[in-house]
Amino acid sequence: MISFLLLIFLIQLAIYIVNTIGSSTIDDLLWILYLRLPMPISKDTRKHGELKHDVVQLKREMNATSSQDEFAKWAKLRRRHDKAMEEYEAMNRSMGSRKTSFQFSIKIARWLTLNGPRLFIQFYYTKTPVFDLPAGWFPYPVEWILSFPRAPLGSVSIQVWSSACATAISLAGDVVIAVVQRRQASNRQAQAVPAGKSEAATK
């Protein structure tokens, strides 16, 4: 069975990844993947795209047709455009409502998957020590803080371990992001220097 140490660390890591990427970005990606599944909504998505194409095409034809010289043709295009636009707006509202419901379900599932287990473990195993501290290594105030709120004195509580994991993951993530950004900046500078030298040589 997976240990509390690793389980809590993995939960905090998953929460950090989701928060770093952004819940809205993940929701949009899952919505796109959902639309590609072989389900009735995929047919509605294709029809939605076709209606949008028809509306744009009819609008172009209307603009290319003179309402004075070719009124009959222009009026026919206008009726077709208005009808297609009405169908498109109705389907657009329907798709928007479906997307809102889908994203709401995803938010609930994400909370139950990440925060739900974390809160359950912290509440249900609040008296269970994650690991014991070496005897006599830390003074009483430090042992009391590390065992807060209800773990045995001389041990590390789940709450403290969870906070430590979250802090360590956040700091490590910041370091990785800073290193990547610095390397990207160095690469851009390295690519810009030869271009500047070549321009100077040309002059």
From Swiss-Prot:
GO terms for molecular function: protein-membrane adaptor activity. One of its GO terms (biological process) is tail-anchored membrane protein insertion into ER membrane. It comes from the Eukaryota. The chain crosses the membrane at residues 5-24, 111-131, 156-172. Residues 25-110, 173-203 are cytoplasmic. Keywords: Coiled coil, Endoplasmic reticulum, Membrane, Transmembrane, Transmembrane helix, Transport. InterPro entries: Get1, Get1_fungi, Helix_hairpin_bin_sf. It is a multi-pass membrane protein. One of its GO terms (cellular component) is endoplasmic reticulum membrane. Residues 72-97 form a coiled coil. It is found in: Endoplasmic reticulum membrane. Interacts with get3. Belongs to the WRB/GET1 family. This is Protein get1. It comes from Talaromyces marneffei (strain ATCC 18224 / CBS 334.59 / QM 7333) (Penicillium marneffei). The lineage of its organism: Eukaryota, Fungi, Dikarya, Ascomycota, Pezizomycotina. The gene is get1.
